[in-house]
């Protein structure tokens, strides 16, 4: 449905490339508009990410859209990310359509005909625009991929049908910002080029005054205003969309710093929900290393096996590279090991995939550290759940996204007592923990987000651990992000673009 109102019902945030900061810009704007009293909601037609979450009504969408909904102070729904692609191989992905698993496709097969996905995305956008005053649309990748332009329903096609003005985001930190902006605009068709109303230069380092001439040059060459130059800022805790920025932190050359709790996490080829580890990464008393290639783990006190979208494939990778023996050695040395979702399955005795859910049918031997057996099934478990650590008065909350059913032979205790799923009472258990407390498995993503759980986990390593008194929660992080952007954006011009009264500074 084309928006015929003279006042835009949407604002589109597109990028000159992948990982220029579109998600963060959209999150900041959602909180800024919400703070101004605007009923705002996020939207991304198609997201390619293994970093997903569960909405309150049991649908799976990208973590970035859940964060944006939190920033906008609205309940996340499947309409905010109607098409989610979860890569499970170099050329294929599981397709989640409006919150539920739809099929598995190769990249070639997916792009042969995108009409089904485009229509679902359009319907979701219509729903959001009917329910909310303003929708902040996030684009995908570069908005000017000309070889895919006729099949791209995420960027300018969405802007056209919604009547959304477009703000173009460029990343100056990677260099070539003039070519990013001017080159992107140069290849766009005139009707789409006319929709672009401003530019945001993201991730600036140094003295902004030294870039004033650069701003003028971009405005002259592009013919549109630069709405702001946003300095690089790390002072907030907000879930990332995918593992692109994470890859630059993998396999650090140095040993863990003494005086901090050293935690290693295996960086699987198909790693998913790596935001499970973000609270550890942000804790000043913890040093977290993502490791892809095998090394001795003797300098670390804890090891985490995170989720993966291809459990048996990544288990084969783990074994073939020699990680399995390194992990067993770490176990013999008394290290603390936690497996989350796919990592939990790997720690078990066997993983069977009789239906070929994640690849070729078959069964794989696990690492054998937990007495559990997993069978992958076609129906995906999606839930938000709460409970407590067995034998402890520590409340836990998390979300489950998995296609496996794991059973224990009873030689270990259950890790969690589950008291509710999707707001319905439950009397269930999750995960296992060995008698010595050194190996833990759980399906709960986000479990370490809870300060009490994180404190409990780190005190298994260092009983004297105390959390940072200045730790910021998610809502405070959204406010900090909005304040940061507000300080560098041309707010009157931004409100002129969306044709709303500018709030008082």
Swiss-Prot record:
InterPro entries: Class_I_gatase-like, CobQ/CobB/MinD/ParA_Nub-bd_dom, CobQ_GATase1, CobQ_N, CobQ_synth, GATase_3, P-loop_NTPase. GO terms for biological process: cobalamin biosynthetic process. Keywords: Cobalamin biosynthesis, Glutamine amidotransferase. The keyword Transmembrane does not apply. It comes from the Bacteria. Residues 260-453 form the GATase cobBQ-type domain. The active site is at 341 (nucleophile), 445. Pathway: Cofactor biosynthesis; adenosylcobalamin biosynthesis. The keyword Thylakoid does not apply. Pfam families: CbiA, GATase_3. One of its GO terms (molecular function) is ABC-type vitamin B12 transporter activity. NCBIfam families: cobQ, PRK00784.1. Belongs to the CobB/CobQ family. CobQ subfamily. Catalyzes amidations at positions B, D, E, and G on adenosylcobyrinic A,C-diamide. NH(2) groups are provided by glutamine, and one molecule of ATP is hydrogenolyzed for each amidation. PANTHER family: COBYRIC ACID SYNTHASE (PTHR21343:SF1), DETHIOBIOTIN SYNTHETASE (PTHR21343). This is Cobyric acid synthase. It comes from Chlorobium phaeobacteroides (strain DSM 266 / SMG 266 / 2430). The gene is cobQ.
């Amino acid at each position: 449905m084309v928006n015929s109102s003279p006042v835009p019902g949407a604002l589109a945030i597109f990028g000159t490339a992948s990982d220029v900061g579109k998600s963060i810009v959209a999150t900041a704007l959602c909180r800024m508009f919400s703070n101004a009293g605007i009923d705002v909601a996020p939207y991304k037609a198609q997201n390619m990410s293994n970093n997903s979450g569960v909405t309150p009504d049991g649908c799976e969408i990208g973590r970035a859209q859940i964060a944006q909904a939190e920033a906008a102070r609205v309940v996340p729904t499947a309409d905010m990310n109607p098409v989610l692609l979860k890569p499970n191989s170099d050329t294929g992905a599981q397709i989640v359509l409006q919150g539920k698993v739809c099929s598995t496709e190769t990249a070639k097969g997916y792009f042969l005909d995108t009409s089904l996905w485009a229509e679902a995305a359009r319907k979701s956008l219509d729903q959001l625009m009917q329910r909310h005053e303003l929708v902040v649309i996030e684009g995908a990748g570069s908005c000017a991929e000309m070889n895919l332009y006729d099949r791209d329903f995420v960027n300018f096609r969405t802007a056209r049908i919604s009547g959304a003005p477009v703000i173009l985001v460029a990343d100056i930190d990677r260099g070539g910002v003039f070519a990013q902006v001017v080159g992107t605009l140069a290849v766009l068709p005139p009707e789409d080029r006319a929709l672009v109303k401003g530019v945001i230069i993201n991730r600036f380092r140094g003295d902004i005054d030294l870039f004033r001439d650069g701003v003028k040059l971009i405005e002259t060459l592009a013919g549109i205003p630069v709405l702001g130059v946003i300095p690089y800022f790390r002072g907030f805790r907000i879930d990332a969309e995918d593992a692109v920025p994470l890859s630059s932190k993998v396999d650090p050359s140095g040993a863990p710093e003494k005086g901090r709790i050293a935690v290693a996490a295996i960086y699987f080829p198909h790693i998913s929900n790596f935001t499970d580890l973000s609270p550890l990464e942000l804790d000043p008393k913890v040093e977290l290393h993502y490791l892809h290639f095998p090394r001795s783990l003797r300098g670390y006190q804890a090891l985490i096996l995170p989720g993966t979208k291809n459990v048996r494939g990544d288990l084969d990778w783990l074994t073939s590279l020699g990680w399995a023996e390194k992990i067993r050695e770490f176990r013999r040395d008394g290290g603390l090991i936690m497996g989350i979702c796919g990592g939990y399955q790997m720690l078990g005795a066997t993983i069977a995939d009789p239906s070929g859910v994640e690849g070729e049918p078959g069964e794989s031997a696990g690492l054998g550290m937990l007495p559990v057996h997993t069978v992958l099934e076609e129906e995906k478990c999606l839930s938000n759940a709460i409970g407590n650590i067995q034998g402890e008065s520590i409340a836990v909350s998390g979300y489950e996204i998995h296609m496996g059913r794991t059973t224990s032979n009873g030689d270990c205790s259950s890790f969690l007592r589950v008291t509710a799923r999707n707001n319905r009472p439950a009397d269930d258990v999750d995960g296992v923990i060995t008698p010595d407390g050194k190996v833990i498995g759980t399906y709960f993503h986000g479990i370490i987000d809870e300060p009490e759980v994180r404190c409990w986990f780190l005190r298994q390593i260092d009983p004297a651990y105390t959390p940072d008194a200045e730790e910021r929660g998610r809502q405070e992080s959204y406010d900090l992000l909005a304040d940061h952007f507000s300080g560098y954006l041309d707010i009157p011009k931004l409100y002129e673009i969306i044709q709303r009264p500018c709030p008082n500074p």
